[in-house]
Amino acid sequence: MKKTVRNFIFGVGLVCMAVAFDSCSKKMAEVKYEYTGKPEYAEFANQVKGVLKVGIECAYAPFNWTQPTKEIPGHPELTAEPIFGSADYTYGYDVIFSKMIADEMGLKLEIHKNDWASIWMGLKAGDYDLVESGSIYSAERDTFLDYIDPYYNRFNVIVVKKGSPYEKYTRLEQFKGLKFTTQINTNWPAYIAQVPDPVVLPFPDTCTEVIMKVAMGDVDCGVMDWPTAYSGCLSNPNVVICQIEKGYDFVTPEGASDVCTPSVIEGNTVAVDALKKAMTAIGWNQESMDKYMKLAIETQPLSN
């Protein structure tokens, strides 16, 4: 009987110790984050617990790309950022911009890689705080996004295979009846529609694939923004950008935009206010856009 009582008491003791240990562990895990940066960013910093999480493709040079090391060839003063949950790194225009914003706010930067087709799902799921990747306003996105200030102003171009007769075309009307494609889930199909009677082929997931299809002759023409087209031509010399005359080129469709703007989930006014203040604080303007896009193009690996 005494042995049974002792065993019972011993068992109860073990349970109590386990509960106490679990409680202690939880308290240690729940150590409150304390922000020590600039007061104007404190509310947002506490919201994100000191980590600015940014969603980008890491496959959209020169805005962003994936590389195996943190080194930037020819620029020892620069380093690529690690991709969350991966052994790879990323760099490009988005990373330059994000790092400047994170540093201004006194936050750690964390880059999350996601395919363009599902990048908004990651934002909705709370995997990251904002999306960049050259994203722009659209009526559909406006139903679930709030926008920060412009971080790049783009214009759009046509790429064709080098040596093709289309290389010398200077007016949209000359591309009549040709085979076109562009990246999926963008507003570029509205630009293709400005060409007379285009043959629109299926849209691939990335601009890199568009460049490849043009280079291989699977399509006659691809439509994308100038930096991405220029970057693609550096990587693939079999593709060139057509020089379209002003007044005979693309116009921004009604209700569309060519202003690239980082965006957060709708209703997150704390994030919008803080990010706007940070962009103002770092003096982001057209000169910044030109300077850092030039740097991104210069540092892009030719394999991207």
Question: Model regions: which residues?
Answer:
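Bilobed "Venus flytrap"/periplasmic-binding protein-like clamshell domains
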Residues: 58-61, 86-104, 135, 157-211, ...
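Bacterial N-terminal signal peptides that target proteins for export
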Residues: 2-10
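Ligand-binding clefts/hinges and TM-proximal coupling segments of bilobed small-molecule sensing domains
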Residues: 27-34, 187-205, 241-243, 274-304
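Periplasmic-binding protein-like
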Residues: 152-160, 234-279, 297-304
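Acidic, polar ligand-binding/catalytic clefts
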Residues: 95, 99, 103, 108-174, ...
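Extracytoplasmic small-molecule ligand-binding "clamshell" domains
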Residues: 31-134
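A ligand-binding cleft/hinge motif common to bilobed small-molecule-binding domains
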Residues: 118, 134-144, 191-194, 215-216, ...
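C-terminal motif of bacterial Sec signal peptides marking the signal peptidase cleavage site
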Residues: 19-23
